[in-house]
């Protein structure tokens, strides 16, 4: 009887422990986004056309993990060349906005001004797809590689005031987020 009880306890722990783990791993993190943007930089340097195709392949786990994905913007015209939402390919990144925050312009301006291959962070507010929870702070790691601006964004659960100074180009987005929460 003791062995059966122990077996049931182990099975229950395995079941409920895995449910909790699945929930915790529903969203990508900064630690996952940064290596992904580095892989995107390397792929763009190797072959831009092949890289953009790979970024658009939702089954390619090098560039799609949980809610993380690589996006690309043609720096000459500001239009998406790769985006998870295929309906955005060919549209202007400058049109992305949340309320008064025209974060698409900020992303494009940041990546255009970035040194070649250097990863820079940009923070803004965005709606998390599939939720009705309102705006969530989001940070995108972006880089300029040749004619492309590339990025990978992850959602932050809560932006702490001390973090505002860590990401200088993002302070205004953080202030807007805090203002909108009040």
Residue ranges, per PLM feature:
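N-terminal membrane-sensor/transducer module of prokaryotic signaling receptors
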Residues: 2-182
